[in-house]
């Protein structure tokens, strides 16, 4: 599955099952064997009732919930206070309970991987965890570092589209873009940088960034890439 096609399919999916399957397929195409996407609405700490999809082993998921591991798992606490990914290095498991958690997760086949924090535009909080199979930790880390830029994009699209499926939000007024905003976003959608767009549109890079800021505000998102996909889905621009 081509990356852009996958992003579009996430946005256009008709339900949670289809959306989850698309996300798993994209992660698999990148080289990850297991994923878990979890999201909470604003101001909620009810981890056991979070919106969760993925292909983690069912027995492990049940044990995780039964043992209350959301309050032990160091990746969970990390995601509440950071936007940076956290790799499943042995050093992050510091307490006795965390060491037990690590041993049990490893026994379930979740040895090497990373977790990407999710912070939504409407206050949603969550994580995208991805596990990779490898001969050793060094091999796993080399692989994850090589695909990290793509994972940043994937988690943005997954967050934006997943939040729309997981939680009901009031319908907002239609997004209206100026002709210049459409032009700027059109070039952004095919991967052009602000500098490249400024050359194409014969304006300053600061002017491009100004329009990008207005576009993100109108869509209520923090990522220009997500705004571009939303604009495509609304028929405001085309790829």
Swiss-Prot record:
A GO term, aspect molecular function: transcription cis-regulatory region binding
Note the superkingdom of the native organism: Bacteria
Q: Please provide the record's keywords in A-Z order.
A: Activator, DNA-binding, Quorum sensing, Transcription, Transcription regulation
Q: Where is the HTH luxR-type domain?
A: 170-235
What CDD domains has UniProt attached to this entry? Answer: LuxR_C_like (cd06170)
Transcription regulation as a keyword of this entry, yes or no, is yes
Q: Name one Pfam family in it.
A: GerE
Task: Give a GO cellular-component term.
Answer: protein-DNA complex
The cross-references to PROSITE patterns, in alphabetical order and at most eight, read: HTH_LUXR_1 (PS00622), HTH_LUXR_2 (PS50043)
Q: Which GO terms describe its biological process?
A: positive regulation of DNA-templated transcription; quorum sensing; regulation of DNA-templated transcription; regulation of elastin catabolic process; regulation of gene expression
Query: Mutating residue 144 to I: what's the consequence?
Result: In strain: IFO 3455 and PA103
Q: Which InterPro entries match?
A: Sig_transdc_resp-reg_C-effctor, TF_LuxR_autoind-bd_dom, TF_LuxR_autoind-bd_dom_sf, Tscrpt_reg_LuxR_C, WH-like_DNA-bd_sf
Residue range(s) of DNA binding per entry: 194-213
Q: Which family does it belong to?
A: Belongs to the autoinducer-regulated transcriptional regulatory protein family.
Q: What else is known?
A: LasR in strain PA103 is not active, this is probably due to the change in position 180 of the sequence.
Q: What does this protein do?
A: Transcriptional activator of elastase structural gene (LasB). Binds to the PAI autoinducer.
**Name of this chain's protein:** Transcriptional activator protein LasR
């Amino acid at each position: 599955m081509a990356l852009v096609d996958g992003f579009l399919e996430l946005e256009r999916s008709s339900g949670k099952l289809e959306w989850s399957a698309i996300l798993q397929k994209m992660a698999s195409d990148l080289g990850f064997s297991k994923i878990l996407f979890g999201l909470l609405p604003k101001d909620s700490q009810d981890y056991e009732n979070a919106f969760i999809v993925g292909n983690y082993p069912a027995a492990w998921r049940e044990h995780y919930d039964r043992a209350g591991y959301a309050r032990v798992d160091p990746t969970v606490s990390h995601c509440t206070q950071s936007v940076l990914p956290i790799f499943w290095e042995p050093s992050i498991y510091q307490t006795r309970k965390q060491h037990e958690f690590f041993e049990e997760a490893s026994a379930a086949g979740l040895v090497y991987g990373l977790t990407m924090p999710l912070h939504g535009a409407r206050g949603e909080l969550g994580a995208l965890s991805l596990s990779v199979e490898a001969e050793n930790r060094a091999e796993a880390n080399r692989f994850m570092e090589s695909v990290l830029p793509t994972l940043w994009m994937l988690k943005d699209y997954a967050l934006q589209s997943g939040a729309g499926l997981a939680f009901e939000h009031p319908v907002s007024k239609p997004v209206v873009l100026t002709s210049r905003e459409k032009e700027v976003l059109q070039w952004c959608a095919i991967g052009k940088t602000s500098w490249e767009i400024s050359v194409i549109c014969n304006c300053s890079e600061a002017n491009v960034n100004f329009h990008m800021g207005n576009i993100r505000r109108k869509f209520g998102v923090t990522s220009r890439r997500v705004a571009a996909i939303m604009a495509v889905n609304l028929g405001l621009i085309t790829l």
